[in-house]
Amino acid sequence: MIVAINEVSETEMRDDSVFDDGSIPTTWEVAGIEDVKGLKLFLKQAQQWVMSNNKEQLAAAVQYPINNIKNKEEMIAAYDQYFTKEVKLSFAMINFNQIFRTYKGVMLADGLVWIQPVGDTYKIFAINP
C-alpha cells in the first residue's frame, strides 16, 4: 500500500551547509530550490514509488521530453529501461543531509538522476541508467 508522505524528520532536515567530508555544497538557492522541505518530501515520496515500482506515479514525476521519451505513456512502457537496479538504489540510498546540488538542480548517485523545481513541484529531468 502506498501512503502519501507528508513529514520530514528533524534528522532529515538538519543543517547541511557542510557535508560530512568537510566540503561545502552549493546553496539551495543556486539550485533553484526555495522549499527544501518540499524537495525532501518529494524525494521521500519518490523513494516509495520506486521501491513499490509505481510506474504511473514515477512517470508523472518526470519532465518530458527526457532522453528519447516524449510522454508519460512512453515512460511507463520503457520503465525497466530507465528505472534500473542502479537507479532504484540511488533513490533507496538518499542521504537527506548530503544532497548534491548545482545550478542544474539536485543530483542523486553521481548523476544517475537529476531533479529540479518545476512550478510548485519537483520533476525528474534526467535519468542516466
PLM regions with names:
Residues 51-52:
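Charged, alpha-helical scaffolding/interaction elements associated with membrane systems
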Residues 1-48, 59-129:
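C-terminal-biased regions
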